[in-house]
């Protein structure tokens, strides 16, 4: 989680002009399919922050809230349906203050700590290594452990790896057995620090790259467990960080992380999650789409040092970041989640699919009750957010083959003081044009083709023509996510205001799909 200040919050009027075209044309290139969309692109992130863990994922075995061995039953079942592929933990900024030995053994003996990064909350360590890794086993997802480099020692991280993954007669394996777990867990992903340029230690790239080399050396592979080591990478426009790590440490890492938030700035108001105008919406869509330029630029730097693409890029924090909801603790980052957030999810996933030759994982922030979450909870109530519904609708693309497309659609020109000032602050050309349609397509192992479409035009239905080429189809069935207002969201009193519905505004004739795509809608189709 980011704790940096480099960009002013700018909520000033912007000028938007839109081309007159009220239709869009997509050409599908199924014959050029090569890349597999890794399921890890749909990864999640859980930090000890606010009520993400306590009250979100975990309530404890003695809670009156229905639970499975301490895990909230309603949340667990919803995540099981989502088919979470990978879960990152324990942070975020919390990771570099977390000492794993405080979170093992009898809960009554675990020491408490102050969560200094996030509101000064008292952390009782009742959710630790066993609780996290057991949850991953229950969900059927890969664990992604973020190790403490900022305030921890090499020995501490090395022993944690041994504790989790050694099946031998080693000291840490014996300690694990003493704490009730005989067989070692399978742990693939290991992050060596988090945001080391900021909350993880305020380090220079050169210093961190040397630390990475040292810490990663002692994170060993035990038995048949093979670690996938991930260096703490850059924040959005910090090209030098990626350059230095690739120059100095690429042969010792399997991946390098990247963080990018759709946020107006890090000083002052970030804007309301639920109260915004049309200009705010379109500016947000432009900021969201800038992630493509950021990914491309970091990939080009990596290509200079690693043309074989042996080192992956992992976008292990992304999503929207608004002001917290009124009446909530500022450091707990609890925000509502509207149809606007759903579009940030769909547009981002469309972009991610295009770059999976290098981009192998993405973890949205965060899974429950924090930032752009899948789920919100309050006492014994739970609600699924519009973002949850996008992830479920897009689940058909996991492990499918990406099908390239050409897209011709209406374009909005983004001008105004907001973008001009941002460009000066970040010393990088910001996005000046915004397509009104975003799309992606894939073919799964059974040969089924799925197409996802987003119409971000808030007022106009668009007729989308999809040329299928050699693909044979006689009909298409699908789901749509939309609502009466772009600011609509689900509440504990009205949990189903924004939810998917059946969609049949599709005609198929002679290799062409004609889709009537309503204003502010997201659709996923299956060709038949």
Regions found by a protein language model. Give the residues of each.
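Bacterial Sec-dependent N-terminal signal peptides
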Residues: 1-23
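Histidine-centered catalytic micro-motifs
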Residues: 258
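Alpha-helix capping and helix-coil boundary motifs
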Residues: 10, 128, 277-279
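Beta-strand-rich domain onsets/edges
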Residues: 286-289
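Active-site His/acidic residue clusters
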Residues: 261-282, 328
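Non-catalytic accessory regions flanking glycosidase/transglycosidase catalytic cores in CAZymes
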Residues: 20-255, 291-324, 328-528
């Amino acid at each position: 989680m980011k704790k940096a200040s480099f960009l002013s919050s700018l909520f000033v009027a912007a000028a938007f002009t839109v081309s007159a075209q009220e239709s869009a044309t997509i050409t599908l290139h199924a014959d050029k399919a090569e890349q597999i969309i890794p399921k890890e692109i749909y990864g999640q992130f859980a930090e000890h922050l606010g009520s993400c863990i306590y009250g979100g994922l975990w309530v404890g075995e003695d809670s009156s809230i229905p639970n499975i061995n301490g895990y909230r039953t309603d949340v667990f079942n919803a995540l099981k349906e989502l088919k979470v592929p990978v879960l990152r933990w324990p942070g975020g900024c919390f990771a570099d203050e977390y000492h794993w030995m405080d979170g093992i053994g009898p809960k009554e003996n675990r020491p408490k700590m102050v969560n200094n990064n996030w509101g000064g909350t008292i952390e009782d360590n009742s959710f630790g290594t066993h609780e996290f890794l057991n949850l991953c086993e229950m969900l059927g997802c890969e664990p992604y452990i973020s190790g403490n480099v900022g305030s921890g020692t090499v020995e501490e991280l090395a022993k944690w790896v041994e504790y989790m993954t050694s099946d031998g007669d080693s000291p840490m394996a014996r300690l694990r057995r003493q704490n009730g777990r005989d067989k070692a867990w399978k742990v693939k992903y290991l992050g060596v620090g988090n945001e080391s340029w900021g909350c993880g230690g305020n380090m220079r790239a050169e210093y961190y790259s040397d630390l990475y080399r040292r810490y990663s050396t002692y994170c060993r592979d035990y038995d048949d467990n093979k670690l996938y080591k991930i260096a703490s990478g850059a924040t959005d426009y910090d090209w030098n960080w990626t350059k230095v790590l690739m120059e100095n440490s690429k042969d010792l890492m399997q991946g390098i992380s990247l963080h990018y938030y759709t946020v107006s700035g890090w000083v002052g108001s970030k804007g309301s999650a639920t109260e915004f105008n049309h200009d705010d919406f379109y500016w947000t869509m432009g900021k969201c789409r800038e992630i493509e330029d950021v990914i491309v630029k970091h990939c080009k730097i990596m290509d200079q040092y690693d043309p074989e693409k042996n080192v992956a890029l992992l976008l292990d924090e992304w999503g929207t970041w608004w002001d917290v909801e009124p009446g909530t603790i500022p450091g707990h980052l609890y925000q509502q989640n509207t149809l606007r957030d759903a579009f940030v999810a769909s547009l981002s996933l469309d972009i991610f699919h295009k770059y999976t030759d290098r981009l192998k994982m993405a973890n949205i922030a965060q899974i429950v009750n924090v930032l752009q979450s899948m789920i919100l909870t309050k006492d014994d109530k739970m609600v699924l957010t519009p973002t949850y519904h996008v992830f479920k609708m897009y689940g058909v693309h996991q492990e499918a083959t990406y099908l390239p497309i050409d897209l011709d659609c209406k374009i909005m020109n983004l001008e105004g003081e907001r973008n001009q000032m941002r460009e000066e602050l970040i010393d990088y050309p910001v996005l000046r044009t915004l397509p009104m349609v975003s799309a992606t397509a894939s073919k799964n192992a059974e040969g089924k083709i799925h197409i996802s479409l987003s119409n971000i035009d808030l007022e106009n239905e668009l007729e989308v023509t999809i040329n299928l080429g050699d693909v044979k189809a006689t009909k298409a069935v699908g789901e749509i996510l939309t609502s009466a207002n772009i600011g609509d969201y689900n509440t504990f009193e009205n949990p189903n205001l924004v939810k998917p519905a059946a969609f049949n505004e599709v005609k198929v004739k002679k290799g062409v799909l004609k889709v009537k795509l309503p204003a502010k809608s997201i659709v996923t189709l299956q060709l038949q």
